[in-house]
């Protein structure tokens, strides 16, 4: 499961570039991705919606309160993200939350937070 955070107006090409670069660095094929996750305030973000359509994957969004339960498992805590969203790490916590929801098992981060100027990426899986 890929978790994504992004600035308002971040376009699909920026998100796809980050996703592909992070997956390539991790040696993971794009077709192994089963879903995308983010925070609920991004549920209508055009770039995220376009990415989900392009990849033909579901996009599941979680509230900051739901993501807060993953705070202790984050590789990086962003004060900037917290100030804007109430969540210290959208990409990692959303990836963990959805991986656990889909598998009904504990999840772990396969690829920790990767970022560009406009977006963050993380990959989680359940063993």
Predicted regions and their residues:
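Conserved mixed alpha/beta catalytic, RNA-binding, or beta-rich assembly cores of soluble enzyme
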Residues: 1-42, 126
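Structural motif
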Residues: 1-2, 34-35, 59-60, 106-110, ...
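Functionally engaged cysteine thiol sites
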Residues: 6, 87, 95
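Predominant activation on well-ordered alpha-helical scaffold segments within soluble catalytic domains
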Residues: 16, 20, 49, 91-94
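Generic secondary-structure signature for well-ordered alpha-helical cores
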Residues: 20, 24, 28, 38-41, ...
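Long, charge-dense
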Residues: 39, 48-90
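Short, well-ordered alpha-helical microsegments
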Residues: 44-46
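C-terminal edge-of-domain segments
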Residues: 91-127
């Amino acid at each position: 499961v890929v978790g994504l955070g992004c600035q308002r107006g971040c376009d699909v090409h920026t998100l796809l570039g980050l996703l592909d670069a992070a997956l390539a660095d991790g040696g993971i094929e794009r077709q192994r991705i089963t879903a995308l996750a983010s925070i609920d305030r991004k549920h209508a973000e055009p770039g995220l919606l376009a990415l989900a359509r392009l990849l033909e994957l579901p996009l599941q969004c979680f509230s900051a309160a739901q993501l807060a339960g993953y705070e202790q498992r984050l590789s990086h805590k962003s004060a900037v993200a917290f100030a804007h969203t109430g969540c210290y790490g959208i990409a990692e916590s959303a990836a963990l939350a959805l991986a656990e929801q889909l598998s009904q098992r504990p999840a772990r981060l396969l690829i920790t937070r990767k970022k560009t100027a406009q977006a963050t990426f993380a990959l989680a899986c359940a063993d």
